[in-house]
Amino acid sequence: MSQGVEFNRLMLEMRSMQMEAMAKAKPVQAPAEVGAPSFSEMLSQAVDKVNETQQASTAMANAFEVGQSGVDLTDVMIASQKASVSFQAMTQVRNKLVQAYQDIMQMPV
């Protein structure tokens, strides 16, 4: 007899938990952030940053080649490697975006 009462109590608890869970399952919308940059703006900023890095590296290399004082070979090499790494990273991001686009376009409708 006590097991039947225990079972009924457990069933009541489970039902109340189910009702609570269903009440909490309302879809929540994320608040729209004012002034948050769009994906295209962020991508454009990243490309601009890579471009600036490459231009700074080229300018530093040109300054070293003409013998401008204050330009050290190690600084030129570090700037060159930073530009190279940033360009390679941007290329990989582009490749991933192209692959994602192709995957989406090949999905059956």
UniProtKB/Swiss-Prot annotation:
Compartmental location: Bacterial flagellum basal body
Keyword Protein transport belongs to the record: no
Chief site of localization: other
Sorted UniProt keywords: Bacterial flagellum
One of the GO biological process terms: bacterial-type flagellum assembly
Record GO cellular component, one term: bacterial-type flagellum basal body
One MF annotation (Gene Ontology) recorded for this entry: structural molecule activity
Classification via InterPro entries: FliE
NCBIfam families per record: fliE (TIGR00205)
PANTHER family documented for this protein: FLAGELLAR HOOK-BASAL BODY COMPLEX PROTEIN FLIE, PTHR34653
Entry similarity comment: Belongs to the FliE family.
Protein name from the UniProt record: Flagellar hook-basal body complex protein FliE
Species of the source: Pseudomonas aeruginosa (strain ATCC 15692 / DSM 22644 / CIP 104116 / JCM 14847 / LMG 12228 / 1C / PRS 101 / PAO1)
Source species taxonomy: Bacteria, Pseudomonadati, Pseudomonadota, Gammaproteobacteria, Pseudomonadales
Gene: fliE
